Regions:
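Hot-dog-fold acyl-thioester-processing enzymes
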Residues: 1-99
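HotDog/MaoC-like acyl-thioester-processing domains
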Residues: 1-15, 99, 103-160
Length: 160
């Protein structure tokens, strides 16, 4: 019988929210600086930095680019929960990035406070040429202070 990497600890983490963070209020300046950095050396689209232009756009105000991350410059570093135990060279400790998918919903606007929470939504195993592989799918969900969904990301980690 082949080993299993899905422990009771992994099963207990399924659908349990962890690593909850709240951003400080997002400012127009935060959005503008992010857009300049992302689009450099080109000029970013006006909806990200020109309040007059943005007021007459479909959004009605300045909005952040999809990739904007209000958690990118934390004051205090936090260690995220490591699923599946330590990373090393032994079987079950090796990790591959299995990719991610992101869906965007309501745009981030100046004044928004973003809440991020992560949960393990699926854990399964397959046997491949590397032997037993455990697939862990985590969901990172962002909402704003009104409870509106901003972004949902699904990340796959593979342990073998």
């Amino acid at each position: 019988m082949s080993p299993t990497y899905i422990t009771q600890d992994i099963r207990n983490m399924l659908q349990v929210e962890r690593d909850v963070m709240l951003s400080p209020p997002v400012s127009e300046s935060d959005i503008r600086k992010w857009a300049i950095a992302v689009y450099w050396p080109d000029t970013p689209p006006r909806q990200f930095w020109d309040a007059d232009y943005a007021r007459n756009s479909r959004w009605g105000s300045i909005v952040a680019p999809h990739e904007f991350n209000p958690f990118a410059w934390p004051i205090e570093r936090r260690e995220a929960t490591r699923l599946g135990g330590p990373i090393g060279k032994e079987p079950g400790q090796r990790v591959l990035n299995g990719g991610s998918t992101i869906r965007y919903y309501t745009p981030i606007r100046p004044g928004d406070v973003i809440r991020s929470g992560t949960k393990l939504v699926e854990a399964y195993e397959k046997t491949g040429r590397l032997g037993v592989m455990m697939f862990l799918i985590s969901e990172i969900a962002w909402t704003n202070q009104r409870g509106e969904r901003v972004k949902v990301e699904h990340k796959t980690s593979i342990r073998y």
